[in-house]
């Protein structure tokens, strides 16, 4: 059984003498919200005015 349980930055952190774990949870990540249209951005799509061929 774990020696102690505490919360790191609002997420659950469980620890004992041999191992420790932070259960997977969205609160474990410090990052801005991921944009919903990320994959439709110009880096990942072909522009309609791009000419093909060589």
Curated annotation (Swiss-Prot):
Species this protein is from: Equine herpesvirus 1 (strain HVS25A) (EHV-1)
Entry's family note: Belongs to the herpesviridae UL25 family.
Annotated localization: Virion; Host nucleus
GO cellular component, one term: host cell nucleus
Protein name: Virion-packaging protein UL25 homolog
Organism phylogeny: Viruses, Duplodnaviria, Heunggongvirae, Peploviricota, Herviviricetes
Task of the protein: Plays a role at the late stage in the encapsidation of viral DNA, assuring correct genome cleavage and presumably stabilizing capsids that contain full-lengtht viral genomes. Located on the external vertices of the T=16 icosahedric capsid, may bind together the tegument and the capsid through interaction with large tegument protein 24.
Quaternary structure and partners: Heterodimerizes with packaging protein 45. Interacts with major capsid protein 42 and triplex capsid protein 22, essentially at the pentamer vertices. May interact with large tegument protein 24.
Top-rank taxon: Viruses
